[in-house]
Amino acid sequence: RGERRTGPRTRVEIVTAGLLLRRLQADPDLPGVTAVVLDEVHERSLESDLLLALLLDARTLREDLVILAMSATADLDRLPAMLGSTGSTSPTSSGGPSGAAPAPVVSVAGALHPVEEVWAPPPRTSRLGPRGVPREVLAHVAATVRRALAERTGDVLSFLPGAREVDDVVSRLRASLPPDTDVLPLHGRLGASAQDAALAPSPPGRRRVVVATNVAESSLTVPGVRVVVDATLARRPRLDVARGMSGLVTVGASRSEGVQRAGRAGREGPGAVYRCCSPTDWARSPLAPT
């Protein structure tokens, strides 16, 4: 966070959506940039939607600007039309300009091993309370991690909605797991060395539990993980109309987020996902983040 390492020989620069937005506001035609790669475009937010709109405007100023959108769960009906070559400037119902040829779709096949679903809803407790995630739910997530360690082999990756919940579950697990099991947090508030430690492989003879926010949902691969414990919760920006301010609220995760999280367990071999909700809650979840 806050680090920048670029120089005269830089060819590829990795930035956040917010930083690229500020750059577009200062230089709408992105001078010196040949291509922009948007990773995980399915993770929609006000910031990412605005970024995509400004990039499409930039392409009207520079026809040579290449925009590449990547995702394992992208909407292949709307996105190619939106990114298609410019014809007329009037939009169609799919979001792209009328008369435009849709952008080409490149599919990259990846090896994904089967992932078994295990339902582990919290007993007699709602996943969300009036003040966020109840402590009983956090205790249940920690108990589910201990259950997964007893029933499965390999390392465990657990998903919580925010840094506070991550730190709470990490404390519970460190106090209850044997000394040969490392428990590591992973979220955006950590320094680079702590994040690197969470992403490093386990030493021989040791097991590891990584408790993370959605930072590990899709963009990162945590080596050695064969089990995912998903609290099935997420943080969303919401606008408070009465106050005219936006803030983060905790909600149930969407099914597309759940699929992405479960996929972390099937990267290196057959795995399992323990979902801390009931099948009914899962079926009622939105298909994509809203």
Report each predicted region and the residues it spans:
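P-loop NTPase motor module signature
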Residues: 1-290
